[in-house]
Amino acid sequence: VLTFDQSFMGDSAGFPGHLSSPDIFTENLSAAVDFLGLQPLVDREKIGAIGICGSGGFALSAAQCDTRIKAIATLSMYDMSTAVRLGMDKVEIQKAKEKMSQQRWIDAENGYPEYLPFFPEQPLDTVPEGLQEPDAEWFRFYAIKRGHHPHARGGFTTTSTLAMMNFRLLDYIDEISPRPILFVVGDRAHSRFFSENAFKAAAEPKELYVVDDAEHIDLYDRRDRIPFEKLAEFFSNRM
């Protein structure tokens, strides 16, 4: 098993930190396959990918073009290229683009990009009152001891969103077939529609597996909710 932080994220290298790139994040999955395939103990015909949240979308995106990925499972999948446009009409999208485009001038003059972290530097004891969902849910994981980490304070550089708005991740999801896809999602996940929409767009073989009594973040760390046996069965039988 190989796990890694995306470029510019966590303990991985890359400047500027907290940059978000649909191209690089997708390419990182293929680079991981490169590395695995060079290990003497690895069967190149049995390399699969598991992606959680946004990494689920990037894993699917990589599998669209990299046929070396033989099976893909996602948990609480987020399609970030769709997420950045949610709730905005065309006028609002244009205003957002204009604001971020102007921010590029400021970033260029400063010599570094604006980054506004979403979560506190130190973990909170409780989630602040008054937060709306899904922000409150993010705080229930990343802002308290449950999931807080100094290298995971949320968000990306302000202008990173422009790239996500410009390139769609899953336009060719049907081309993953005949390789199998397993979408795992909580029944109470605010992000459930991402998996459901991707499931509809994907070709067979595919499966949508709904976990009872689970919200989005529960599939990050709750061992009583993550369907380990289902995942093990999927990869054992499909590769």
Model-derived features with residue positions:
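Active-site nucleophile elbow and catalytic-triad environment of alpha/beta-hydrolase enzymes
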Residues: G87-M88, G155-I173, H190
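Short beta-strand/loop motif that positions the catalytic acidic residue
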Residues: I176-S177, L182-V185
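Alpha/beta-hydrolase-fold enzymes
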Residues: L60-R140
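Short beta-to-alpha linker loops that shape the active-site pocket of alpha/beta-hydrolase fold enzymes
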Residues: D5-G10, Y78, D212-E215
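Catalytic active-site module of serine/aspartate enzymes centered on a nucleophile-bearing elbow/loop
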Residues: D212-M239
